[in-house]
Amino acid sequence: MGFEELLDKVGGFGPFQLRNVALLALPRVLLPMHFLLPIFLAAVPAHRCALPGVPDNFSNEDAWLEAHLPREPDGRLSACLRFTHPQALPNSTLWGEGQNSGEQPEGEPSTVPCPQGWEYNHSEFSSTIATEWDLVCEQKGLNKAISTFFFAGVLVGAEVYGYLSDRFGRRRLLLVAYVSSLALGLASAASVSYIMFAITRTLTGMALAGFTIIVMPLELEWLDVRHRTVAGVLSSTFWTGGVMLLALIGYLIRDWRWLLLTVTLPCVPGILTLWWVPESARWLLTQGRVEEAHRYLLRCARLNGPPVGEDSLSREALNKVAAAERMVRRPSYLDLFRTPRLRYISLCCMVVWFGVNFSYYGVSLDLSGLGLNVYLTQLVFGAVELPSKLLVYLSVRHAGRRLTMAGTLLGAALAVGLRILVSPEMKSWSTALAVMGKAFSEAAFTTAYLFTSELYPTVLRQTGMGLTALVGRLGGSLAPLAALLDGVWLSLPKLAYGGIALLAACTALLLPETKQAQLPETIQDVERKSAPSSLQEEEMPMKQVQD
């Protein structure tokens, strides 16, 4: 008897599992709030060079600014430069700051970076890290780098938590993730310098990676196979809830320190709920901890209410299951590249996942040039994720996985690319295209999880998902840095996001369709699929899945 059969006997889907999903909802809500926090935390409000005070006998502030600030090619006053000497204006006495009256320099007036710092418009944000440490103009790269540092921490933390959770257990490491996220989040909010904030934010990313790695297995390892997809879709709605909740919290709290505290403190009730979160019985059996597994399985059976025979949960039966679980060899990433067909699938999936993450976070973090304020835009971006999931559900059933994957990525690429052609004055069109880009990128994210899981054989499914998620996190960490390309050409970041999404869409078309296909069980099953003979495919020992 295997663990799946054992789980069927105690109830693979019932009150016990539903309670578990509810208890593990909090980490899924917290993740998007931290992942997308730079939208508010690192926002750059309108700013200009700090200037000397307007003289008492001069009432025209616009003329005062005109005398001190040069204009950009688009006609706006410069946010990063000021004239070395104020320019003379008709019928004014401004000329002469720092020089004798009548001594006007010849040629083009010289400019300098803001020597006295910047003045910020605080109507939308009372305080951000950009206003706190003047991360604008020549220092704007440091502002964008915060997101990259954070995602780099997630990248490293995912590997660390993956190893430690297999060794020390899911529940114990989830406690570590909660406590470390709380401590490092508080430290980030108390940062007194940019360096301190960058370090603590990177470590916070490492801590939060525990949620991404542990929560899903802790849910799925208590669910039977039939209900895992339903639970996965239900859990994904918690992410959408977190995206929308962030918009509300950001609107109510305009100071970055208090905002960071607000999205961090829910870790406290999360720690308390761990008392009711069960450890994975499957993991306990692989570690030979039969008594603990027996206790959790009995608790599951009592709560779900199915009749369980004494023989099913006897120590002898559990010892046999434990022995069978320990005999399963733990695969490595190298196993994904040992055979031609599997290597081909893995390389294609890596490109697709990089494109999905790169475009999703690129679109999500780029709210510039839209007609709505940042809070309403974020709320709309969150709300549009729900119909996106419905779109995926309908499309994968009728058009198939491959076309849905390619189509959603192509839609994201077109929406982002068309924004380049829209003039800055056409705010409504730019906003509509941005919302469409977010909808398609979210749909691509949802499809990627389903499609990838069906491409890999059972023996390597988790390993394959782990590799593609790793590459995806790399794409997510690079997406904020791509925004710096606007220094070369204003539309270059959008071209990068759209171009990578288009490349991923083309790559998705190279993958095999899995709609109404049999899930491969072994590596040999995957390799046989490359053979042209349909007879070989019919003979493959694979199980049928409903589309």
Curated annotation (Swiss-Prot):
This is Solute carrier family 22 member 7. Residues 91-103 have a biased composition (Polar residues). Functions as a Na(+)-independent bidirectional multispecific transporter. Contributes to the renal and hepatic elimination of endogenous organic compounds from the systemic circulation into the urine and bile, respectively. Capable of transporting a wide range of purine and pyrimidine nucleobases, nucleosides and nucleotides, with cGMP, 2'deoxyguanosine and GMP being the preferred substrates. One of its GO terms (molecular function) is transmembrane transporter activity. GO terms for biological process: alpha-ketoglutarate transport; monoatomic ion transport; prostaglandin transport. InterPro entries: MFS_dom, MFS_sugar_transport-like, MFS_trans_sf, Orgcat_transp/SVOP. Residues 91-112, 521-547 are annotated as: Disordered. It comes from Bos taurus (Bovine). The keyword Transport applies. SUPFAM superfamilies: MFS general substrate transporter. Pfam families: Sugar_tr.
